[in-house]
UniProtKB/Swiss-Prot annotation:
Catalyzes the 2-thiolation of uridine at the wobble position (U34) of tRNA, leading to the formation of s(2)U34. The record marks H129, Q339 as: Interaction with tRNA. Its main location: cytoplasm. Disulfide bonds join C104-C200. It catalyses: S-sulfanyl-L-cysteinyl-[protein] + uridine(34) in tRNA + AH2 + ATP = 2-thiouridine(34) in tRNA + L-cysteinyl-[protein] + A + AMP + diphosphate + H(+). InterPro entries: MnmA-like, MnmA-like_C, MnmA-like_central, MnmA-like_central_sf, Rossmann-like_a/b/a_fold. The gene is mnmA. Belongs to the MnmA/TRMU family. It is found in: Cytoplasm. This is tRNA-specific 2-thiouridylase MnmA.
């Protein structure tokens, strides 16, 4: 019987390394690949834990040698710049706060990498994500990881049925501590490697500076205003701010104020008291459903408005033009345009979309 072939994306970290080991132990014919995404026109600064960096390639190659699996580096530079970096920069210029990891998953890891895998006759792609995939009731379902603290389903809500059918995520059945334990047991040097947490293409995590360098003619100073339009001070460019931000505003008003809105048309940043950043209703676009084919009517769910948020009770309702209205039971802090909102029903990912506006 021919072994099923799987191409696994290896970042050089402990999760994808152990995922490769687990798949080999399960009898798959495993091929390791690292996506080459760093941009040669920029000075590339190394950072410990950086995903897909130059040192990450070396770590991934050493793991592949240890596991005795083939290993390749694939050039994804152009696609990464077009689908992730340019998108990231454009969204901030439009006054929104994007999630580049979700774009990377959607366009690179589970689209282009899957196409390349199919091109060499592979049956699956695999990653080290903490999530589970199961077929239930005739649909492939995305299910929360065993390790709730490390669950990564929020960043995977865009996966289609075809992508889920051809994707393996073995780490979803384990806790992070157990994954590190397995890595140590089998002698992988990356067993204690630090997790990558920041944006991989911005080494110092200063996104404002990065965007200014990438699009210097698009960022200009403007006014801080209150909700009535009264000028309160000067800002250095809307790309430096996000909803709910308090620190780094440089305003001395004798009272704490928070960013409540960003207007790219007038190039203004609206600030106000903390109660102004609590809202209950939003509209989202670019919807992808997983557990259901489409939303026929109102559905009670739990929803997350950002990666680090706790799921909160909400009702989702279909709107015209493919939009979905999300109404939370309790007010949510700093709902931010450009971020994703993801819907859950128990352990299943119902779907999600991009936050377009607040009501």
């Amino acid at each position: 019987m021919t072994k099923k072939k799987v191409v696994i994306g290896m970042s050089g970290g402990v999760d994808s390394s152990v995922a490769a080991y687990l798949l080999k132990e399960q009898g798959y014919d495993v091929i390791g690949v690292t996506m080459q995404i760093w941009q040669e026109d920029k000075e590339y600064e190394e950072r410990e834990g950086g995903c897909c960096s130059l040192s990450a390639v070396d770590d991934a190659r050493r793991v592949a040698q240890k596991l005795d699996i083939p290993f390749y580096v694939l050039n994804f530079r152009d696609s990464f710049k077009r689908n992730v970096i340019d998108y990231f920069v454009d969204e901030y210029i439009q006054g929104r706060t994007p999630n580049p990891c979700i774009a990377c998953n959607k366009y690179l890891k589970f689209d282009e990498l899957l196409q390349k895998a199919k091109g060499i006759g592979a049956d699956y792609v695999a990653t080290g994500h903490y999530a589970k995939i199961e077929e239930r009731d005739g649909r492939f379902q995305l299910i929360r990881s065993k390790d709730d603290r490390k669950d990564q389903t929020y960043a995977l809500y865009n996966l289609t049925q075809e992508q889920l059918e051809h994707t393996l995520m073995p780490c979803g059945e384990f806790t992070k501590d157990k994954i590190r334990e397995i890595a140590k047991e089998i002698g992988l040097d990356v067993h204690n490697k630090k997790d990558s947490e920041e944006i991989c293409f911005i080494p110092d995590n200063n996104h404002g500076r990065y965007i200014c360098e990438a699009a210097p003619n698009k960022v200009r100073p403007g006014n801080f205003v209150d909700k009535y339009g009264n000028v309160l001070g000067k800002h250095k460019g809307i790309v430096y701010y996000t909803i709910g931000q308090r620190k780094g505003l440089g305003l001395a008003l004798g009272r704490p104020v928070f960013v409540t809105d960003i207007n790219p048309v007038t190039n203004t940043v609206v600030v106000g008291p903390e109660e102004d950043i609590f809202k209950t209703d939003l509209v989202c676009k670019d919807i992808n459903f997983i557990s259901i084919d489409k939303l026929e009517g109102p559905m009670e769910v739990e929803a997350k408005i950002r990666y680090s948020a706790r799921p909160a009770k909400a009702t989702i309702s279909p709107m015209e033009n493919g939009r979905v209205k999300v109404s939370f039971e309790d007010k949510q802090r700093a709902i931010t345009k450009g971020q994703s909102v993801v819907f859950y029903k128990d352990d299943l990912v119902v779907g999600g979309g991009i936050i377009e506006s607040l009501l």
